Amino acid sequence: MLLPVRIPILSTIISKLFAYRPILRRLTSTHCIVARPVRAPENATELTSSVILTCRDEEENIEGLVNAIPQLGKHTEIIFIEGHSKDNTVVKIQKMIKQYPEKDIKLYKQSGTVQGDAFQLGFDKANGDLLCCLEVDLAIDPMEIGQFWDAYVSGRGEYINGTRTIYQMEKKSMPFYNFVGNRFLGNIFTPLLGKRFTDTLCGLKAISKRNYKKIRSNMKKFGGFDPFGDFPLIFAAAKGGLKVAEIPVHYRPRQYGASKAYEKSFLTFYKNAWLLVKMSWIESCKCTSL
């Protein structure tokens, strides 16, 4: 109840229209807390992992990435999702498959053109117990994936989101307006979802295959709005009751090629950001817990 005094008709209208809205729901007189048992630590030696890598025109980064990905659990699957490259990215990946037969490297080509489509294809194709998503630009050291593995195995998080805004970045890692935009979106998402977010567009994130299957249907509610693929995953994880954890990662300039995320103009970036904020507000009120 948002209006503590009973006023015929008005009390009902206010409660129906506003009481469940983000931020305003914190002002209601009734609060529900849902608790569950603490998840016991997983046996890391029995778990497997899949590292999903989205790439487009990243020929020079492929081999360094393959060599840098750590072994997680008893088996690590490396999945490349290629997005219509104009250079020799596909040829390079095929070469890595032949050159490193001891590594379980797989290549799939996305039918769509946006990163969200690539991530979803990777999630669906992956066979590991823990799914880690990483962009191929080497702006984040692949060794940092180990922190996400440890967080999941220990029970610290069920959806683990990387954040680039905690540690000091190397120069020219991220345009200033993108940094401000990321912090702004984080400040919007925190009260909307009741989970702390300082970076909503980090290229490194992790979720178990089991939990992904649980929230996949809710992700479809947001897929048409977000071309990046981050927001559907964040919303579905938070609304699905998953334990969210943020892990700081070091961020540096990409090693090769041009950034796909920052190639648009200042105004275009914020136009898209505003669209996603509106989507967040509307859909967060409609999305129900699983």
Predicted regions and their residues:
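Acceptor/aglycone-binding surface of glycosyltransferases and processive sugar-polymer synthases
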Residues: 108-125, 130-133, 142-223, 254-270, ...
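Conserved S-adenosyl-L-methionine
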Residues: 1-5
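Hydrophobic helical membrane-anchoring modules
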Residues: 8-54, 60, 64-67, 71, ...
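Short loop->beta transition adjacent to catalytic acidic/histidine clusters or analogous donor-positioning motifs
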Residues: 47-50, 70-80, 102-106
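A conserved acidic beta->alpha catalytic loop
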Residues: 82-91
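Conserved donor nucleotide-binding strand/loop of the catalytic core
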Residues: 76, 90-125
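Active-site acidic Asp-centered loop
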Residues: 83, 134-136
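Donor nucleotide-sugar binding loop of glycosyltransferases
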Residues: 58-61, 85, 141
